Amino acid sequence: MPTVFTAAHLWDGDSLLEHPILAVEDGRILSISTRATAESPSTPNTLDFPNATLAPSFLDVHIHGASNHDVMEATPAALDSIGRFLASRGTGHYLATTVTAPVDDTLRSLSALAKLLNKPADESPIARPVGIHLEGPFLSHLKRGVHPPEHLQPANIALFDRLYDAAEGHVRLMTLAPELPGAPALATHATSRSVRVSVGHSNATAAETRAVIAAGAVSATHTFNAMRPLDHREPGILGVALSEDSLYAELICDGIHTTPEIVRIWSRCKGPHRAILVTDAMSATGMPDGEYRLGGLTVTVANGRATSGGVLAGSVLTLDRALANFLRFTGSTLEHGLRLLTTNPTALIGSPGLAPSPGHIAPGLPANFVAINPDGSLAASFVRGQQAS
């Protein structure tokens, strides 16, 4: 017997429906109707969210870990723990994001992640990685953040191919500093292998940034953070990230990496179709204050701030809190906010194998969705039709 979900609204990734009736069976969406076109369901298997909006589960394209595990551990236990926590906070899919490390260590992690990604998904209600985001090693020494300088590498196509091959083609996104010699050639090569290139961790000029965009870059990594600051005579990478209409731009909306004023500037520049909310979360996410790992680094978390050597080292943010913060900081509509963690990240990394899911609710798709309160807070999360907790 199907389970029926009713709510005030349903946003399917394209349009907003009032008074929806969502039927789910065997982990997939059976049908979508409204109380204007169908009778109210009379089944004992009905869950009603009278004030909430049903929406696609979130997609995080920049996350290093959670629940005391780092994705570079690349073990079934680590990804299971990360996935269960993320699902409980509304995230259904993510890109397992690396941090700069010795090349051999990175190769081992990528190879192990590939083996896990190649396995058929079971029916457990957990978030699953849909690929890998290479954050490093092709980053600027000046804007490296906590990435260890001794393991940063020049823009090297041969090394990229070793990393890509170790990951068995699962690299979907790569952060690249545009000012590195050879960066445009690497961007072109990565794009030819269906890897989306994101500019970031960079002290690049505007001209250097535009050259890499012309070579194929399509996004900016955690905009404002680890970037050359804006100057009216040399707008740099940040000026291009904000002003280039075609470029997607990530943002960590936690009130620590960016202030409400900065969030409003970013939102007004990028609009509803090129802005992407990310967490940059690390293993301490969902855990109490203390010391945790980010790749090979030791990170101290106190009062929601993750640092290593006094430098911000990822976050302990979840996407449901990022959404609530965004709505509170900007006064935007819920539909606008939902785009930034569903359809926009899906469009960034999208391919025939992913579209139209994640990022959409439609008959036949896996029943991965959330119920969101009017203030953006999470009411419930469902993966394959099962409530995640």
Which role does the model predict for each range below?
Residues 57-59, 198, 275-278:
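Residue-level marker for buried hydrophobic side chains located in beta-strands
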Residues 102-108, 179-181, 198-203, 252-269:
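Active-site glycine- and acidic-residue-rich loops that bind
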Residues 355-389:
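C-terminal cap of metal-dependent C-N hydrolases
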